[in-house]
């Protein structure tokens, strides 16, 4: 009977390496999301993209600023995401702002539909990235901020900026003082030595004249 080699047996039983959950490359992010909304639960969704769209996205030509998400007939759709036409697409090029379907599990869609029934809750796109060579979109359940909340965010940003400036000023100040001390101390010591030498010379000259 033919015996199985140890190599083939070990290769079959060897575990396949797990795919990393860290994004390979972040292509675009919605910077205004944290300013305009209170973000809650996040979900990772896949996208149905065309070949010309993937080429444009690889060149980081994408804008999430005007994109929004809605649910229709138990499906999640991404609208107004801007992906420009690719220069080599030709007649097969895509519509830059076409509707794009998001790929989620059934239990995730059911959970999102339940949460979207709450008044004031919406879905917001956060980040567009590639993971293991596949396009992914990070979406979040969010609640809109009022004008007072936005003013508080601006105040917090200004406070953090002022604190960072104060820290930088404190860190730079000791270095400047050290440099001035290093530059001043050698000159003062040289001047003292020169004064002492001049006094010694004048004393010697006086002694000679007296003799």
From Swiss-Prot:
GO molecular function, one term: RNA binding
Any GO CC annotation of this UniProt entry: cytosol
Pfam families: SmpB
InterPro entries cross-referenced by the UniProt entry: SmpB, SsrA-bd_prot, SsrA-bd_prot_CS
Keyword Isomerase: no
Residue runs in coiled coils: none
Region (Disordered): 1-20, 170-211
CDD domains: SmpB (cd09294)
Main location: cytoplasm
Subcellular location field: Cytoplasm
Annotated keywords: Cytoplasm, RNA-binding
Regions of compositional bias (Polar residues) in chain numbering: 177-187
Presence of the UniProt keyword Cytoplasm in the record: yes
GO BP terms: trans-translation
Family: Belongs to the SmpB family.
Job of this protein: Required for rescue of stalled ribosomes mediated by trans-translation. Binds to transfer-messenger RNA (tmRNA), required for stable association of tmRNA with ribosomes. tmRNA and SmpB together mimic tRNA shape, replacing the anticodon stem-loop with SmpB. tmRNA is encoded by the ssrA gene; the 2 termini fold to resemble tRNA(Ala) and it encodes a 'tag peptide', a short internal open reading frame. During trans-translation Ala-aminoacylated tmRNA acts like a tRNA, entering the A-site of stalled ribosomes, displacing the stalled mRNA.
NCBIfam families: PRK05422.1, smpB
Name under which the protein is recorded: SsrA-binding protein
Protein species of origin: Tropheryma whipplei (strain TW08/27)
Gene, per the UniProt record: smpB
């Amino acid at each position: 009977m033919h015996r199985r080699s140890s190599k083939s047996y070990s290769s079959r039983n060897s575990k396949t390496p797990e795919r990393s959950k860290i994004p390979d490359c972040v292509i675009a992010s919605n910077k205004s999301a944290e300013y305009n909304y209170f973000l809650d639960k996040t979900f990772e969704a896949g996208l149905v993209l065309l070949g010309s769209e993937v080429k444009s996205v690889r060149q980081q030509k994408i804008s999430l600023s005007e994109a929004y998400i809605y649910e229709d007939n138990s499906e999640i759709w991404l609208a107004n995401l801007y992906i420009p036409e690719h220069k080599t697409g030709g007649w097969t090029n895509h519509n830059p702002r076409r509707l794009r379907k998001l790929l989620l599990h059934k239990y995730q869609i059911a959970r999102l539909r339940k949460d979207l029934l709450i008044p004031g809750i919406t879905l917001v796109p956060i980040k567009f990235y590639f993971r293991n060579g596949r396009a992914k979109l990070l979406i979040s359940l969010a609640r809109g901020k009022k004008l007072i909340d936005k003013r508080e965010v601006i105040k917090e940003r200004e406070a953090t900026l002022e604190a960072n400036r104060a820290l930088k000023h404190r860190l730079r100040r000791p270095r400047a003082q050290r440099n001035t001390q290093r530059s001043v101390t050698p000159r003062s010591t040289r001047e003292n030595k020169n004064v002492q030498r001049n006094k010694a010379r004048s004393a010697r000259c006086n002694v000679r004249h007296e003799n």
